[in-house]
A protein has these predicted regions:
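Nucleotide-activated donor-binding/catalytic signature segment of Leloir-type glycosyltransferases, i.e.
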Residues: 209-228
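Aromatic "clamp/platform" in nucleotide-sugar-dependent glycosyltransferases that forms part
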Residues: 245
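Carbohydrate-associated surface elements
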Residues: 131, 150
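Conserved acidic donor-binding segment of nucleotide-sugar-dependent glycosyltransferases
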Residues: 277, 281-288, 297-302
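Short alpha-helical donor nucleotide-sugar binding micro-motif in glycosyltransferases
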Residues: 119, 224, 232-237
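Conserved donor-binding/catalytic core segment of Leloir-type glycosyltransferases
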Residues: 4, 164-200
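Short hydrophobic beta-strand element within catalytic cores of glycosyltransferases
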Residues: 262-265
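Acidic anion/phosphate-binding donor-loop and adjacent secondary structure
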Residues: 106, 151-165
Length: 350
């Protein structure tokens, strides 16, 4: 199957972590024998001037790729504006909603209207969790599948707990951007309540200076790391924490489980579909005491956890790629007109 991949997030030499889950899924589709061509944006294609130009270029590149590659189907990531590029190709398309793109609908009537147009003209929509699918509330007649981007269990394997030579107690790890939504400030407050252990923070963002200034004793900032660097930090940790105010799915969560690590995750969003008391704790992200209690509960679980590894295996990249391939194949078998007019049973665009 000839697939044209369109995404506004994709890794580069400067930002190897940026949209790496999209790239890995594309590679998994290639490994299944598909011919996948990429038309993508990178982290540098951002800013009030750069962004419109980048999307205009993305549209031109997508149309040129259609003429040259003649894809059977377009596989797009993120609803708007990437979905508008998919529409312009006039090829049947499947689009994945990741969460932030769904939140954007609530912030702007214009984005909401454009998103509905993208949904109605799609052959299918893939959501990374049941939570995202519920938040999306796709119009009647739109096919919705729930498939996350998968975790590379061939690369991320369970490793024994590293020896605590300094006797400092549990080693907690946070992986993600340093923004309000990720709730790292409350994680730091919860960690301070424990009175022991270490907390390593991997990632960067606008709150880094503030978080460094208020970090309790035992906190270490590791900065933005490559995928291999993240894997190395997971191997050193006992518990990986993801206490976001809202988390659509949680890629770092699956990576931690694949390494056999216990997790602490927000109960608001997709993690509630994965995390059980046998592999971690779900917490109230607004309650520091709840986060602290979850950290203690997770720290008491075995490391490496075979149950965590088993759960991660259900989301292994080859399994998810096979599911995505099936959705793409169904879309490719349909009329090309799917890509240029509303689906049967859906209301006309407004």
């Amino acid at each position: 199957m000839r697939i044209l991949l369109v995404s506004n997030m994709y890794p580069s030499a400067e930002r190897p972590d940026y949209g790496v889950f999209v790239a890995r899924l594309a590679d998994a589709l290639r490994e299944r024998g598909n011919d996948v061509r990429d038309v993508v944006l990178h982290a540098g294609d951002r800013g009030p001037i750069a962004t419109p130009r980048a999307y205009a270029r993305l549209g031109r590149q997508a149309r040129a790729a259609v003429a040259e590659h003649r894809p059977d189907v377009v596989y797009a990531h993120f609803l708007v504006p990437t979905g508008l590029v998919a529409i312009a190709t006039r090829v049947p398309y499947v689009i994945t909603a990741h969460g932030a793109d769904v939140r954007n609908m609530r912030r702007s009537p214009v984005v909401a209207a454009l998103t509905k147009r993208v949904l109605r003209r799609s052959a299918a929509v893939i959501c990374v969790s049941e939570y995202v699918a519920a938040q999306l509330a796709a119009p009647e007649g739109v096919t919705v599948e729930v498939i996350d981007c998968g975790v590379d269990t061939a690369r991320l394997r369970p490793v024994p707990r590293a020896q605590d030579v300094n006797g400092k107690g549990p080693r907690f790890l946070y992986i993600g951007s340093l923004t309000r939504r990720k709730n790292v400030e409350r994680l730091q407050q919860a960690f301070a309540k424990l009175g022991g252990g270490t907390l390593t923070i991997v990632g960067g963002g606008p709150l880094e200076a503030e978080l460094r200034a208020t970090a309790p004793v035992g906190t270490r900032f590791a900065g933005v790391l490559s995928s291999d660097g993240v894997a190395a930090e997971i191997a050193k940790a006992d518990v990986v924490c993801l206490p976001s105010l809202e988390e659509p799915q949680g890629q770092a969560l699956l990576e931690a489980l694949a390494c056999g690590r216990a997790v602490v995750a927000t109960r608001v969003g997709g993690p509630a579909e994965i995390v059980t008391p046998r592999i971690g704790a779900l917490v109230d992200p607004l309650d520091v005491d709840s986060i602290a209690a979850g950290m203690l509960a997770a720290a008491a679980l075995p490391v490496p956890s075979q149950e965590a590894v088993r759960v991660a295996a259900e989301h292994a990249l080859p399994i998810q790629a096979e599911k995505v391939e099936a959705v793409l194949a169904r879309a490719a078998d349909r009329s090309p007109e799917i890509g240029v007019r509303p689906r049967s049973g859906a209301a006309a665009d407004t």
